[in-house]
Amino acid sequence: MKTHNSKWIGPAALAAAIALAAAGVRAEETPTGLPVYRAESCCDLCPAAADPNSYTSNYMKGFVTLVQGNESDWLFRTNEDLRTEFGTTPEGYRQLKALHDAFKSRGVELVIVYQPTRGMVQRNKLLPADYARFDYDKAVRNFRATLKHFEQLGYWVPDLTPLTDEKVEPAFYFRGDHHWTSYGAERSARIVAETVKEIPAFADIPRKEFVTKKMGRMGKRGTHHRVAGQLCNTTYAFEHSDQFFTEPKGEGGGDLFGDSSLPQITLVGTSHSGTNYNFAGFLSEYMGAEILNVAFPGSGLEGSMLKYLASDEFQKNPPKILIWEFSPLYDLAEDKFYRQALSMLGNACEGEKTLLAGKATLRPGEAGKEVLINGAGRLVEATNSRHQVDIRFSDPSVKKLEGTIWYMTGRREKFQFDKPVTTETNGRFAFNMRDEADWGGLNFFAMEIQPPEGLKEPVEVEVRLCKRHDYHAPANLTARSGN
């Protein structure tokens, strides 16, 4: 399994003892004489936690409103962890179908790993009043209906609902964080692996045995705990959980692969798929196949997907199977994601005939510059529904694109596309022109681009407009019910 390097915690005993004691953690003697540290319950939520108006920043609004579990350090978000509605809008499902068909045209089978919520999995940790108020049966019913809808669009969809209402330890989720623990990742990977094995393309993927080993302990000050601390001026102890790594059986250290070939299965997703929780490793062990893990912290729904689609790894050697992990909190109807993904999946304007091109130098403190004009040299037909743009900055660290598009009718569109700040980027943005509702028939006139935020030196920007890709799945590709 190819992954990024991970860090794990193994502090000196004295330093650890001091730090843990300061965080409300006590040590108990064991028969071996070695101390075992246990976090004591910390805090009760204050009245501000129950007031949605207390959650003032955009980040904090994602935690409205925190409620305390039957142990004080178990916290839940009522809007997200205790939700009973899932899925997306008709437009969101239409976009998901288009994305599936585009991947299918490249010979890629897509697997959606849709995580059950913390409330569905850990409802036994709720206080009696919240336990009674949370409509678990409705949540599971709607969750399964969403999985079925994904499947009808052509995706392969493992059903993780057997993991709900768990009463086993170690827990699936952290007490005070939205991430799953390594144990939650492992239990999910078992189910996902069985679905992947059903895909006909999996039969042609080389097999390899993997083994998973414990590598130490991970310390986490959870997202729920941090927000509660801001609201109530409290400090929760670090929560510790086992951390694992996976390697080919019989091989230790060195090259994890033994060869330089790319795996034929790729994992994209949120920070849940990052190396901290070893989800990719567990998948490799249970599938018996290598995985290219391109997920990274801070990726969100689309970050690792878009970065991977723009990479040489995907463009020159697309995988046979792409596993896409995300949670229900993300908006699957977000048009900006699909506009970028459907453009980059075909490498945007690379290899396509350029209809319009322009360049400009953007300088700190200056206003935006017009970089592309239809009719300056020649007038071309450039309706939104049939075209895309490919934009490249000379500085690869640019992570935000802002600008305005004008149309022949006089209408205009302000646009903004962002990349995660937690990963290296290449300065390239590409997207299909806006085509929903009455936008599709508009004809492009001009584009203005703003200097990037925090710009200190002049930067060059080049823009190309070309026809968008027309994805038609070849008939000889494996079909599945709903395809």
Curated annotation (Swiss-Prot):
It holds the Pfam family ALGX. Residues 1-27 form the signal peptide. Disulfide bonds join C46-C232, C349-C466. It comes from the Bacteria. GO terms for cellular component: periplasmic space. The active site is at D177, H179 (proton acceptor), S271 (nucleophile). One of its GO terms (biological process) is alginic acid biosynthetic process. Keywords: Acyltransferase, Alginate biosynthesis, Disulfide bond, Periplasm, Signal, Transferase. Residues 350-480 are annotated as: CBM domain. Pathway: Glycan biosynthesis; alginate biosynthesis. GO terms for molecular function: acyltransferase activity. Monomer. Plays two roles in the biosynthesis of the exopolysaccharide alginate: protects alginate from degradation as the polymer traverses the periplasm, and also plays a role in its O-acetylation. Probably has acetyltransferase activity in vivo. Belongs to the AlgX family. This is Alginate biosynthesis protein AlgX. It comes from Azotobacter vinelandii.
